[in-house]
Amino acid sequence: MNKNEKMVRSLMGTVVSNKMNDTVVVRVERRVKHPKYGKFIKRSTKIHAHDKGNEGQIGDIVTIRECRPISKTKSWTLVKINERAEKVE
């Protein structure tokens, strides 16, 4: 890695909304251990990500990475679509 490059955080999640122009809402799940009982619990976060070509559809599994702030709520951008959602007709 060059000294000019820096590590960029990337996450994987599911698209839950694509109603905005150039934006998708991605739900990222993580597993957290309960402090007292030790059971693993699913916790999720909804992140607004920039989707330049409006390619993300609801149900797609996508990879997003952190970037400069694009708007008040968007600091992530869509990198690639790992798995497309099944079409329901």
Swiss-Prot record:
<dbReference type="GO" id="GO:0019843">
    <property type="term" value="F:rRNA binding"/>
</dbReference>
<comment type="similarity">
    <text>Belongs to the universal ribosomal protein uS17 family.</text>
</comment>
<keyword id="KW-0687">Ribonucleoprotein</keyword>
<dbReference type="InterPro" id="IPR019984">
    <property type="entry name" value="Ribosomal_uS17_bact/chlr"/>
</dbReference>
<dbReference type="InterPro" id="IPR019979">
    <property type="entry name" value="Ribosomal_uS17_CS"/>
</dbReference>
<keyword id="KW-0689">Ribosomal protein</keyword>
<dbReference type="Pfam" id="PF00366">
    <property type="entry name" value="Ribosomal_S17"/>
</dbReference>
<dbReference type="InterPro" id="IPR000266">
    <property type="entry name" value="Ribosomal_uS17"/>
</dbReference>
<dbReference type="InterPro" id="IPR012340">
    <property type="entry name" value="NA-bd_OB-fold"/>
</dbReference>
<comment type="subunit">
    <text>Part of the 30S ribosomal subunit.</text>
</comment>
<dbReference type="GO" id="GO:0022627">
    <property type="term" value="C:cytosolic small ribosomal subunit"/>
</dbReference>
<keyword id="KW-0699">rRNA-binding</keyword>
<comment type="function">
    <text>One of the primary rRNA binding proteins, it binds specifically to the 5'-end of 16S ribosomal RNA.</text>
</comment>
<dbReference type="GO" id="GO:0003735">
    <property type="term" value="F:structural constituent of ribosome"/>
</dbReference>
<keyword id="KW-0694">RNA-binding</keyword>
<dbReference type="GO" id="GO:0006412">
    <property type="term" value="P:translation"/>
</dbReference>
<protein>
    <recommendedName>
        <fullName>Small ribosomal subunit protein uS17</fullName>
    </recommendedName>
</protein>
